[in-house]
Every structure is written in structure tokens, then in C-alpha cells.
UniProtKB/Swiss-Prot annotation:
<protein>
    <recommendedName>
        <fullName>UPF0434 protein Smed_3047</fullName>
    </recommendedName>
</protein>
<dbReference type="Pfam" id="PF03966">
    <property type="entry name" value="Trm112p"/>
</dbReference>
<dbReference type="GO" id="GO:0005829">
    <property type="term" value="C:cytosol"/>
</dbReference>
<dbReference type="InterPro" id="IPR005651">
    <property type="entry name" value="Trm112-like"/>
</dbReference>
<comment type="similarity">
    <text>Belongs to the UPF0434 family.</text>
</comment>
């Protein structure tokens, strides 16, 4: 996969919120995930598409 293809459009990032908390998300380029610090969840991005399902999110351990 092209490295640039996995980047998240900043405008999309402004629109997306955590489905659990409705809070802001940040992009983690190393893991290619959208992270909700408040919910302690990381949502995967697959083939350039954010998967915004709580059931698909990875729990962030401390």
C-alpha cells in the first residue's frame, strides 16, 4: 500500500468523532488508527477507510 494512501484527510478528521464519547479523534500514523483518548480506544483504518465501530476498536492499555 502506498504510504500516502494511508494518511487521513484533515477535513475528514475534523468531522469524525468517537462513536462512544462523541469526542475528538487524533490520527496515529504509526499504527494507522484514529485514537480517542477519552474512550481509550483506537479505531483502525483499513484500505483508507476509518472503521468507526466500537466492536472493531482496539482498547488502549496504560
Amino acid at each position: 500500500m502506498d504510504v500516502n494512501a494511508s494518511k487521513v484527510d484533515p477535513k475528514l478528521l475534523e468531522l469524525l468523532v468517537c462513536p462512544l464519547t462523541k469526542g475528538r479523534l487524533s490520527y496515529d500514523p504509526e499504527a494507522n488508527e484514529l485514537v480517542s483518548e477519552k474512550a481509550r480506544l483506537a479505531y483502525p483504518i483499513r484500505d483508507g477507510v476509518p472503521i468507526m465501530l466500537i466492536s472493531e476498536a482496539r482498547k488502549i492499555e496504560e
